[in-house]
């Protein structure tokens, strides 16, 4: 006998159903974790449905090429469907895969990544790097809203701008979860209502910090009261005033995190990887693949505060890091100094434009790049001109990685290894590492 269940639905801010309830056989999954079904030859995307399921759904957005539908009932569930570990999953927009078993999440991501890189790799070539699926996130940006005169702290909802008030987040580290609950209780006093834009919570080796981004100035009295709260809760508090790029430090200056035997300093607004365990594994894998030696001069593009640069410098003859953010370059130089490196140089440069620097005129044997989502297409010709024997590309956007890698292959490189890195379990996000070798 077929089982029938009724999933909890999301916010009413979504488009309302416009068609009758219909039965669908789901045979695929999109990168956004929507089930793919076909009815009378037309594709329908159903949020919350999984491959292999028979469901009832109601179209709420009709298009010329495809429809989108609301899941009403699950008639026959997938064997891989699991109960979400978070009570807010059906409302909160933070996670998209909690209803799918962890091993199948990886399988779905691998299928999607192979599709993106179909012109570059075969199915057998894709490796996987993963760690614990919950309690991993050491950084979170929390949204603020006012409802019925009270401040609401949470995340944006699924496919909506509504702020969902949450009581727990299973992907946050335990220390961030505890700080979140303390902060939520403190905000009930409403003394920051209308002036607090959002909050960033962050955990590192030094402890927990909170960055408050203000929409207008506050009094010294109010600021002191919050600093007292932070001190009691052992939270380092930072303020960012309106239209000021650099954080105004309330209690402490720079933060730091440990990476193996190395200690890296950074400012609280600087980019660092949110998954500490996966960052460690990623760096170890990068060292293994690139295999730096005392014969290597390595160029580290989009280097940040030196997350790859310093580990590379342990083994290489020299490492040159390039980063557009001046504050991160300053932090990277400080990291080289305090960790005792004299073979590290850092350059502040915009890699979307030609870079003229004496450091680039020496023989560079290998290149590592970790660009933003837009990729590094503008700088590829410069890399090709440098002529490194190997290029290690770390990507947070598989589509731009595919574009850039196909260009490099056309210019004389070949793909040696590719790894899916599950940096964000319970979400559809995919990180990728690719090693390319110059053809002889």
Curated annotation (Swiss-Prot):
Gene: rlmD
Domain TRAM: residue ranges: 15-73
Transmembrane intervals: none
EC number: 2.1.1.190
Lineage: Bacteria, Pseudomonadati, Pseudomonadota, Gammaproteobacteria, Oceanospirillales
Protein's job: Catalyzes the formation of 5-methyl-uridine at position 1939 (m5U1939) in 23S rRNA.
Key word Transcription present: no
InterPro entries: 23S_rRNA_MeTrfase_RlmD, MeTrfase_TrmA_AS, MeTrfase_TrmA_CS, NA-bd_OB-fold, SAM-dependent_MTases_sf, TRAM_dom, U5_MeTrfase_fam
Protein name: 23S rRNA (uracil(1939)-C(5))-methyltransferase RlmD
Active site per the UniProt annotation: 396
Catalytic reactions on record: uridine(1939) in 23S rRNA + S-adenosyl-L-methionine = 5-methyluridine(1939) in 23S rRNA + S-adenosyl-L-homocysteine + H(+)
Region annotation (Disordered) ranges: 1-21
Keywords annotated in UniProt: 4Fe-4S, Iron, Iron-sulfur, Metal-binding, Methyltransferase, rRNA processing, S-adenosyl-L-methionine, Transferase
Family, similarity comment: Belongs to the class I-like SAM-binding methyltransferase superfamily. RNA M5U methyltransferase family. RlmD subfamily.
Binding, S-adenosyl-L-methionine: 273, 302, 307, 323, 350, 370
